[in-house]
UniProtKB/Swiss-Prot annotation:
InterPro entries: Ribosomal_uL22, Ribosomal_uL22_bac/chlpt-type, Ribosomal_uL22_bac/org-type, Ribosomal_uL22_CS, Ribosomal_uL22_sf. Keywords: Ribonucleoprotein, Ribosomal protein, RNA-binding, rRNA-binding. It holds the Pfam family Ribosomal_L22. GO terms for cellular component: cytosolic large ribosomal subunit. The keyword Plastid does not apply. It comes from Rhodococcus opacus (strain B4). This protein binds specifically to 23S rRNA; its binding is stimulated by other ribosomal proteins, e.g. L4, L17, and L20. It is important during the early stages of 50S assembly. It makes multiple contacts with different domains of the 23S rRNA in the assembled 50S subunit and ribosome. The keyword Transit peptide does not apply. This is Large ribosomal subunit protein uL22. Part of the 50S ribosomal subunit. GO terms for molecular function: rRNA binding; structural constituent of ribosome. One of its GO terms (biological process) is translation. It comes from the Bacteria.
Length: 134
């Protein structure tokens, strides 16, 4: 899969209907956006949030897609784009006193990660974007 914004090759992975709320998953995704895949996986390994496990799986899957489908070097991969969309909401009821029932919304997420292969110059996409904005 080629990205029209950059000349660098990209690979994508998506996890749909993950049983974690989008707000909590976005906190985890914000930790790793713009970092190398190796750094991102190390950060997520020790992150205390429950959403770090599915996000790490998606990043590892995107890296595997880049390595197997596009023959890219895993050491040059950077998490270029990562975002979380809201999935379907499972609606459940919590019984309450006197015949009442409260609704429980079990939210799901769609986690998307796009990894990009950068030349071995050592600059990350985060540094490049900051320089171009000025």
């Amino acid at each position: 899969m080629s990205n029209t914004e950059t000349a660098n090759p990209t690979a994508k992975a998506v996890a749909r209907h993950v049983r974690v709320t989008p707000m909590k998953a976005r906190r985890v995704v914000d930790l790793v956006r713009g970092r190398s895949v190796e750094d991102a996986l190390n950060i997520l390994k020790f992150a205390p949030q429950a959403a770090s496990e599915p996000v790490a799986k998606v990043i590892a899957s995107a890296a595997a897609n880049a390595e197997n489908n596009l023959d890219l070097d895993p050491s040059t991969l950077v998490v270029a784009t990562a975002f979380v969309d809201e999935g379907a909401t499972l609606k459940r009821f919590q019984p309450r006193a006197q015949g009442r029932a409260f609704r429980i919304r079990k939210r799901t997420s769609h986690i998307t990660v796009i990894v990009e292969s950068l030349p071995k110059t050592g600059t990350s996409t985060r540094n490049r974007r900051k320089g171009s904005a000025q």
